[in-house]
Swiss-Prot record:
Function recorded in the entry: Small subunit of the glutamine-dependent carbamoyl phosphate synthetase (CPSase). CPSase catalyzes the formation of carbamoyl phosphate from the ammonia moiety of glutamine, carbonate, and phosphate donated by ATP, constituting the first step of 2 biosynthetic pathways, one leading to arginine and/or urea and the other to pyrimidine nucleotides. The small subunit (glutamine amidotransferase) binds and cleaves glutamine to supply the large subunit with the substrate ammonia.
Keyword set includes rRNA-binding: no
Protein name: Carbamoyl phosphate synthase small chain
Family statement: Belongs to the CarA family.
Length: 372
């Protein structure tokens, strides 16, 4: 029997019938969600607060998690510098070993943080076995329990991940303004934005106005923006009909537009392309993407379970980036409209900053458009 240092047992269940028992940490309780994994070796506070993980149970493949604890939030200009949102977004966390922290700026342990926010965790389980299951069979629904006796985990799965519009949980209810040196406005359609994206946009010097995910084209254009950004967010893009419709309406104004992650997928759908569920997705901070225009390869951060393939791209677009590992299209450029997209996260957080220049490219598009 596994010795649990906190005296709490836990379990992780996959819908294929796999059931592993280990040690519980964090909050006591039972949660269900889509089981996914990340190969990132660090950056767990950023990953766990990334709204794109909403509705998912996250397995971290690195064997030791919690080493450097959890810092106090640092906020500048209304933007978090060391978290991607104000709360933990994942449904639960699965690790091989949950360790006690040892770092000068740690304010609390991973266990304490998760307990405070009501998120269960399970450790002392074979994460390699779980990841191999997900890689072989694909992402699947699962149940995580900490400190709770669960007879039949299957009964806790209420809905399929692909059927839920998670943006209603991650989008702001009203507009949020980040005033900057320039009065010129960039409207950011916020379906669950990472604060790393906010920070990079703020560095462009423009005032950023975050509007709710389902904002209409008229509501967006009321701000007289110089450019528009459709950011990341959780869930299945194919069920976000209103968002796709609004994207199409916004593009009629021919303003410089940047789509990131979910924004890339929504752009693809709005322009007549297809977006497919991937077998187990890309979730890592060291994924390669190749710029087709110059054959340069960059290392980038990814978090997506849906993808666009070469045969799926919309008319009048050309591939900008592609993942050389599996051929997934990681960026598009429109041939006639001032639109660029990336499936990967050019802001990283966590991850390398090889592609932060994408935001400067967008800034140049906005300035060029102003000069016309």
């Amino acid at each position: 029997m596994t010795y649990c240092k906190r005296g709490t047992e836990g379990l992780i269940y996959l819908e294929d019938g796999t059931l592993l028992r280990g040690c519980g940490f964090g909050a006591k309780g039972v949660r269900y969600g889509e089981v996914v994994f990340t190969t990132a070796m660090n950056g767990y506070p950023e990953s766990m607060t990334d709204p794109s993980y909403r509705g998912q149970i996250l397995i971290i493949t690195h064997p030791l998690v919690g080493n450097y604890g959890v810092p106090n939030p640092i906020v500048r200009n209304g933007i978090l510098q060391n978290f991607e949102s104000e709360q933990i977004q994942i449904e639960g966390l699965v690790v091989t070993e949950e360790t006690d922290p040892s770092k000068w700026n740690s304010s609390k342990s991973l266990h304490q943080w998760m307990a405070e926010q009501g998120i269960p965790g399970v450790s002392s389980v074979d994460t390699r076995l779980l990841v191999k299951k997900v890689r072989t069979l694909g992402s699947m629904m699962g149940v995580i329990a900490s400190g709770e006796h669960v007879e039949d985990p299957r009964k806790y799965i209420e809905m399929r991940y692909d059927e839920i519009d998670f943006t209603k949980f991650t989008s702001p209810k009203s507009p949020i303004i980040h005033q900057n040196n320039s009065p010129d406005i960039i409207v950011l359609v916020d379906c669950g934005i990472k604060h790393g994206i906010l920070e990079e946009l703020y560095k462009t010097g423009f005032t950023i106005v975050r509007v709710p995910c389902k904002s209409s084209a008229d509501e967006i254009m009321n701000y007289s923006p110089k450019g528009i950004v459709f950011g990341n967010g959780p869930g299945n893009p194919n069920i976000l009909k209103d968002l796709v419709k609004n994207f199409s309406a916004v593009m009629e104004y021919k303003l410089p537009t940047l789509g990131i992650c979910l924004g890339h997928q929504v752009a693809t759908l709005a322009l007549g392309g297809n977006v497919r569920k991937m077998k187990f997705g890309h979730r890592a901070i060291n994924k390669p993407v190749t710029d087709i225009s110059n054959n340069k390869c960059y290392i980038s951060t990814h978090n997506h379970g849906y993808g666009v393939y070469k045969e799926d791209i919309p008319p009048d677009t050309q591939i900008w980036f592609v993942n050389p590992d599996d051929g997934v299209v990681e960026g598009l450029i429109h041939k006639r409209l001032p639109l660029i997209t990336t499936q990967f996260h050019p802001e990283a957080r966590p991850g390398p900053n090889d592609t932060t220049w994408v935001f400067q490219k967008f800034k140049k598009m906005v300035i060029k458009d102003e000069g016309n």
